[in-house]
């Protein structure tokens, strides 16, 4: 891999900025200053530093975000705060959220630059489970839970697919679905005459929101988490 391309991928700089850094002698490879932008780097074995700071190469990047309410799931927006604003300190280009959580919805959101993984996780054919904590306006009955689990008419061509429903309180359920239709959870509860007051995604496939990850916080996925979620596709 060219040295300037390596810098773009690991330091979050533009190609022009990378070339300028190389010319200024700010880059060292295996302890030796390297001033050739087209120098071939062995990305998995060479030690590269930028102004003395070591750079590590990863083909793709994966972050777990505890999305707070009040921000939208988008890469950019001129009027609203987005989930990507929370990760603005990460010097990684081309990151995007996998799927969408409504502005008022909290919980687990995967941020990555791995398009293939995102496609597989979101594909209806892959049947990746997504679990939500749902708090509703009115008491939810066992009959309501049965209807939700069997599938309900939310105004689309087809009813929703079967879901897993666990009633945990009078006005609170755990709902696991495999689809990702527009406002699906809210529309499902409307279909049984109720209204969602609070919605939080707890898991997506094998990836589960840790209890100690506070709202608005994020962290990189561990190697084990990456391995498992790639197995979900």
What positions do the PLM features span?
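Basic, flexible Lys/Arg- and Gly-enriched helix-loop patches that mediate nucleic-acid binding at interfaces
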Residues: 1-233
């Amino acid at each position: 891999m060219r040295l300037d391309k390596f810098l773009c991928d690991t330091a979050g700089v533009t190609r022009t900025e990378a070339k300028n850094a190389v010319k200024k002698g700010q880059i060292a490879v295996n302890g030796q200053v390297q001033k050739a932008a087209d120098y071939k780097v062995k990305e998995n074995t060479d030690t590269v530093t930028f102004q003395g700071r070591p750079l590590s190469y990863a083909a793709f990047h994966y972050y777990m975000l505890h999305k707070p309410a009040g921000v939208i799931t988008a890469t950019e927006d001129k009027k609203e705060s987005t989930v990507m604003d929370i990760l603005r300190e990460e010097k990684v280009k081309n990151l995007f959220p996998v799927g969408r959580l409504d502005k008022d919805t909290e919980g687990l959101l995967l941020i990555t630059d791995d398009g293939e993984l995102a496609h597989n996780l979101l594909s209806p054919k892959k049947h990746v489970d997504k679990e939500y904590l749902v708090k509703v306006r009115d008491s939810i009955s066992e009959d309501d839970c049965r209807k939700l689990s069997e599938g309900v008419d939310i105004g689309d061509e087809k009813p929703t697919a079967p879901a897993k429903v666990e009633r945990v309180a009078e006005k609170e359920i755990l709902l696991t679905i495999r689809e990702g239709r527009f406002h699906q959870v809210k529309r499902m509860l409307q279909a049984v005459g109720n209204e969602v007051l609070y919605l939080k995604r707890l898991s997506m496939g094998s990836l589960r929101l840790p209890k100690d990850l506070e709202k608005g916080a994020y962290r990189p996925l561990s190697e084990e988490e990456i391995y498992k979620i790639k197995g979900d596709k």
